[in-house]
């Protein structure tokens, strides 16, 4: 996975694993910001519990996976990431691809959740148009005595499961576009099956 994509994935969970500062437009409990805050509370509670009881890490990791699955729209993310190649895939192939991508993203997220990074987040605004929403934030990432400011936008849509994130844009770099560019290049130069094999090998790599 490219450095740019790893960086985008890293910051894509920043706002739900940190203390949030600043002010944003008032949000309803069922709105996108409300969803973010509820997820933040749950994630932080689980992380505090895990820190107090390392022996119970596996059950907590399973719960973290469940919470993330309720927050990230994996089917939509997979469809957008595969782009024009999605239509050529059968229902079984789509399900297999979506599951591989889900496992990779969840593993990456859980790795970052355990990394003890220090973030400060400010909400800059919320824009809702019908069933689509965009939340803009500014994040200061602190690690090993260094700070880096990033502008993060979260693309969300409202479906049967409520508001869910389907893309994260970091300093104008989209996670979905990064995936789509990489996947399309592999498919064009090799094949769709070659892409699946690369994803499977990535899952076998140590987390």
Spell out what each predicted region is.
Residues 167-207:
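Low-complexity, intrinsically disordered terminal/linker segments enriched in charged
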Residues 5-10:
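N-terminal export leaders
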Residues 20-28:
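Sec/Tat signal peptide C-region and signal peptidase I cleavage site
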Residues 29-109:
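Early exported N-terminus immediately downstream of N-terminal targeting peptides
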Residues 101, 125-127, 139-141, 154-156, ...:
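A mature extracytoplasmic/lumenal domain signature
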Residues 149-177:
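Short beta-strand edge/turn micro-motifs at domain boundaries
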Residues 11-19:
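Bacterial N-terminal signal peptides
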Residues 107-148, 199-207:
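Surface-exposed, charged secondary-structure patches
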């Amino acid at each position: 996975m490219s450095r740019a994509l790893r960086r985008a994935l890293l910051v894509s969970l920043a706002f739900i694993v940190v203390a949030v500062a600043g002010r944003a437009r008032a949000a309803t409990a069922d709105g996108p910001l409300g969803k973010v805050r509820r997820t933040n509370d749950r994630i932080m509670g689980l992380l505090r519990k895990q820190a107090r009881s390392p022996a119970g890490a596996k059950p907590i990791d399973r719960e973290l996976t469940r919470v993330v699955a309720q927050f990230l729209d994996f089917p939509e993310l997979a469809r957008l990431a595969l782009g024009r190649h999605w239509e050529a895939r059968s229902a079984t192939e789509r399900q297999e691809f979506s599951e591989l991508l889900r496992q990779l993203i969840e593993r990456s997220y859980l790795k970052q959740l355990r990394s003890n990074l220090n973030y400060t987040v400010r909400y800059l605004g919320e824009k809702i148009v019908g069933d689509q929403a965009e939340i803009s934030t500014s994040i200061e990432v602190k690690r090993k005595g260094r700070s880096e400011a990033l502008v993060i936008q979260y693309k969300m849509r409202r479906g049967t499961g409520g508001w869910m994130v389907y893309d994260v844009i970091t300093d104008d770099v989209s996670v979905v576009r990064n995936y789509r560019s990489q996947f399309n290049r592999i498919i064009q130069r090799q094949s769709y099956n070659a892409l699946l094999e690369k994803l499977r090998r990535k899952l076998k790599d140590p987390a």
